[in-house]
Amino acid sequence: MSDQIYFFDTTLRDGEQCPGASMNLREKLEVARQMERLGMDVIEAGFPCISDGDFEAVHTIAREIKKCRIAGLARCVKADIEAAAKALEPAGERARIHIFLATSKLHMQFKLKKAESEILRMAAEGVSYAKQFVQDVEFPRRTLPAQTWTS
């Protein structure tokens, strides 16, 4: 395991969820440029499938920012992964698809109505599919029991 620490910023996506915190494309690009100047390792630029505006923001930031990895968020759904891959094309080797899937017991039981084994299968398939487009795929373990992910 590496001792290297990487900084991953979600301001352009997660930060926009705060009331009154939305940014237009120019503002997002300005923030991304400042993050680049500060030496941020990874910038999560948006959720490309959610709107044309988010797609364009991710695509523009992927094209303009040269020193950081650029991430696009996607659910474990082929259409989301494809939208993220398309938006991230200008980033080339710096592209990262950040996949998520509801994994808490409550979400699995009541929202997705799926067993843990099915969630694990969906996660593995989503990561494998994303790897067809980019080399860097992130899938955070969120509230699944630790024993599920041990080898």
Task: Give the positions of each predicted feature.
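Glycine-rich, proline-tolerant flexible connector loops at the mouths of alpha/beta enzymes
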Residues: 40-75, 102-112, 140-147
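A short N-terminal beta->alpha junction/helix N-cap motif
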Residues: 16-26, 45-49
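Catalytic domains of carbohydrate-active enzymes, especially glycoside hydrolases
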Residues: 28-46, 88
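N-terminal amphipathic alpha-helix/helix-capping segment at the start of soluble metabolic enzymes
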Residues: 1-22
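Alpha-helical scaffold elements within enzyme catalytic domains, especially in hydrolases
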Residues: 34-37, 60, 129
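Short, well-ordered coil/turn segments that N-cap beta-strands
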Residues: 2-5, 39-41, 66-70, 92-95, ...
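Hydrophobic, small-residue-rich alpha-helical packing segments that form membrane-like cores
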Residues: 79-151
